[in-house]
C-alpha cells in the first residue's frame, strides 16, 4: 500500500518544483512585497530514514541557502518543522507516532534545525495542523490501524506523543536561541449552532472542543477537564511516562 503504482500520475511529487526554482520564486515574492514566507521542512530531506544519528548535509545546505535567499529579499521565513511527512521508514519500522520512540527522532530533527539555522530562522511551528491526527491519522501521524484495536485510543495516544514532542521542541528552541518564537498550527474553523436551541449550542461547543483541545494543551501545559471526562466515558487511558 505504500508504493507508487505504474500508470498513475502523481503531480504532487513535482508540484511547483520549488526545489529547483526557489530563487526565482522568492525573488518574485520580494517583488510583490511579501514580508513573510511560511514553508515546511521535509523531514526525510534532513534525515532520510528518520532514525539516523547524522543528518544529510545536502538537505541542510539547501534550506540554509533558501533562508538566506529569503533574507536577501527582505522576507522573514516562518518554518513548519514537519508537515504531514513522517519518513516512511518510521512508519513501517516503528508504527509512526503511536510509538514513543518518535519523540527522540523528532527531538534530533529539531536540535539539528535550531542549531544549524540559528540567526536565519526565528519563527517556528512544531507541527502542521496537529489536530488532523483525529481526522486523517495516516496523513497526520503515520498511523495504520490494526484490526480490532481501539482507534480513538491509538489516535489520542499519538496526539499525546506529538504534544509532548511539541513542548520538548519549544523548550529546546529557547535554549538554543532565546530569540526563537515557537507556535502551534491548527486546521479548524468555528462551529456555529444551527438554531438558538441549547442542544445545538452544546453540539457546536463539543465540535469546537475537538479542535481547540490541541491549543488548550499547548497554551496551558495540561489536559483540560473536558478531555479527561470524554476519555473516561470512551474508555481511553493514555500512557504517560516521564
What do the predicted segments below correspond to?
Residues 1, 6, 50-51, 61-242:
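Active-site region of glycoside hydrolase catalytic domains
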Residues 1-56, 60, 66-72:
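N-terminal structural segment of carbohydrate-active enzymes
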Amino acid at each position: 500500500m505504500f508504493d507508487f503504482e505504474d500508470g498513475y500520475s502523481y503531480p504532487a511529487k513535482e508540484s511547483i518544483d520549488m526545489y529547483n526554482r526557489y530563487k526565482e520564486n522568492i525573488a518574485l515574492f520580494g517583488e510583490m512585497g511579501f514580508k513573510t514566507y511560511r514553508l515546511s521542512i521535509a523531514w526525510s530531506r534532513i534525515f532520510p530514514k528518520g532514525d539516523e544519528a547524522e543528518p544529510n548535509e545536502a538537505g541542510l545546505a539547501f534550506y540554509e541557502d533558501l533562508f538566506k535567499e529569503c533574507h536577501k529579499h527582505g522576507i522573514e521565513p516562518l518554518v513548519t518543522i514537519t508537515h504531514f511527512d513522517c519518513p516512511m521508514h518510521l512508519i513501517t519500522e516503528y508504527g509512526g507516532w503511536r510509538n514513543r520512540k518518535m519523540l527522540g527522532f523528532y527531538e534530533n530533527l529539531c536540535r539539528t534545525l535550531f542549531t544549524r539555522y540559528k540567526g536565519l530562522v526565528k519563527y517556528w511551528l512544531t507541527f502542521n495542523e496537529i489536530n488532523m491526527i483525529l481526522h486523517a491519522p495516516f496523513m497526520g501521524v503515520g498511523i495504520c490501524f490494526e484490526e480490532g484495536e481501539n482507534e480513538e485510543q491509538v489516535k489520542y495516544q499519538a496526539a499525546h506523543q506529538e504534544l509532548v514532542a511539541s513542548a520538548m521542541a519549544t523548550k529546546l528552541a529557547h535554549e538554543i536561541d532565546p530569540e526563537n518564537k515557537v507556535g502551534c498550527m491548527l486546521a479548524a474553523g468555528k462551529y456555529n449552532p444551527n438554531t438558538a436551541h441549547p442542544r445545538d449550542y452544546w453540539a457546536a461547543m463539543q465540535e469546537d472542543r475537538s479542535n481547540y483541545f490541541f491549543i488548550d494543551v499547548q497554551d496551558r501545559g495540561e489536559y483540560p477537564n473536558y478531555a479527561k471526562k470524554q476519555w473516561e466515558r470512551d474508555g481511553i487511558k493514555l500512557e504517560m511516562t516521564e
